[in-house]
Structure formats: C-alpha cells, structure tokens
A protein has these predicted regions:
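Alpha-helical cap/lid subdomain in secreted, periplasmic
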Residues: 74-248
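Serine-esterase "nucleophile elbow" of acetyl-processing enzymes
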Residues: 1-68, 214, 220
Length: 248
C-alpha cells in the first residue's frame, strides 16, 4: 500500500481539472474538500503507485497545514488494516506557517495570505495571526513536529519518505540539523523541493497565476521518486505481486 499525504501538490490540484476541491464541481459537491478525482488520477502519488504496482490511498487536501497532515496520517495508520511492513508513506510538506484551528467541531486550515475565509468568531484572531507570523519560529516548529512524526513512524518500522513542496529547512542551524538518512529528500536546500525540481526541469505551472503543475509534471515527479526509491534500496526485488520493500 502506498499512502500519500500533503497539500494541493499531493492532491494534484488543477493537474487536469480546474477544480482543486471536489465540492467546487457542481456534480461532486457531496465530496466536500476531497481532491477532485480527475486530478487524483494523474497525481504523482497515483502514478507512482502504478509504477510500483501497489494499492493507493491519498489523504491530501489542498491548502492543508502540516498539523493536518500529521494528524490525518497518524489517524489513518492507527486505523488501517494494512500490515505496517507492507506500507510505504510519502508526504509532501506544506508551507511552514499554515495552521489548523478547531472551530465548533470543524477543522479549518489557515495560511498567512490574509485572504482565507474565516468564521466571524475568529476573524480578529486570524488578522493577528497574519500580522504576527514569525517565520523563524514557524520553521523550527514545523521541523520539530516533522521529527516527531518521523520518530513515531520509525518506532512502528514503517517505511516513509518526506519531501518539501515549497519551503525548505536551510534556516535550521547546523547544530540543530539531524541526519534523516533516506527518509527526507534534501530537506536543507533550495533546489531540493518539489517545485524547484519541476521548475529546473522545464515544467510550467498550469496558468501564469497558479502555484500548481500539470499532469506531465506529476508524472515526472513520480519517476523521480521511483528512481530515488530504487537507488536507496527501499524497493529491491520484484515478484509476481510487484515490487517488494526491503526491510531495514
């Protein structure tokens, strides 16, 4: 089983359908904030699952905070029937400043853009959040939270790979940096992010004012991840059921 989580870049937003959320499509309003299924079909996660011949589950949501990503990843793993040694988790991290707020029993995702749709009860709090974002503090907070998830997955002996979509951890001081082994793709460099890789390889955003890439770019990232997985010997052998994971 390949389980992926992240924000719009993992949800495949706009990859082939203009709607990021299923609910934006009049025919799919009942699906709420799930990714539009047309986009999931061509997303890097789905394409990678086809390459490694594994079943697939996408838990990503456009505009998701890393708090949401961590919460939903742990919830899914704690409830899955998939044996942990047959599971590969890949997460593309969101921007560091985003937050998740629980308001009237509903989770909301907020960034520092200042244009989020916020319930009246929390508009003042949101304005304060946008005005006072401390990027250094948010960067270190994200780093520590991701380390905790990594350690949790390690303790469960679950294979996992992390990568940065937009932001990176170059601002983390050398003394505070850990060696992630194969578990984190280039966490400390500008050119190690998802968008930097695609930009440097000539893939354009779907429109001039979009943050998102098309199906061709998602396929390219899937091929990059496959090469990474094979080179790091996360997958080592092939049998009748497909590629097998090397247990470390």
């Amino acid at each position: 089983m390949l389980y992926v989580n992240g924000d719009s870049h993992t949800a495949g937003a706009e990859a082939t359908n203009q709607h990021a959320f299923a609910e934006d499509d009049p025919n799919l309003e009942m699906l709420g904030r799930l990714p539009h299924p047309d986009n999931v079909k061509v997303s890097w996660g789905k394409k990678l699952s086809e390459l490694i011949k594994y079943s697939f589950f996408c838990d990503a949501e456009s505009a998701a905070s890393n708090t949401r990503i961590i919460r939903t990843t742990k919830d899914w793993i704690e409830n899955t029937k998939t044996p942990y040694d047959e599971l590969l988790v890949i997460i593309g991290w969101s921007t560091w400043e985003r937050e998740e707020w629980l308001i009237d029993s509903e989770y909301y995702q907020f960034g520092a853009s200042g244009i989020d749709d916020v319930p009246d009860s929390h508009k003042d709090k949101y304005k304060e959040f946008v005005s006072n974002v401390d990027w250094k503090q948010k960067t270190y907070e994200a780093y520590e939270n991701i380390k905790k998830l990594h350690n949790w997955l390690e303790n469960l002996k679950i294979k996992h790979i992390f990568f940065n979509c937009n932001n990176n951890f170059k601002k983390i001081k050398e003394k505070d940096r850990m060696n992630w082994g194969y578990n984190y793709i280039s966490p400390y460099t500008d050119n190690g992010t998802y968008d930097a890789y695609l930009d440097s390889n000539g893939y354009d955003k779907v429109t001039h004012n979009s943050w998102h890439y098309g199906a061709d770019a998602h396929a390219a990232w899937a091929r990059f991840l496959l090469k990474y997985i094979v080179e790091k010997k996360i997958i080592t052998t092939r049998n009748s059921s497909g590629l097998k994971f090397n247990r470390i």
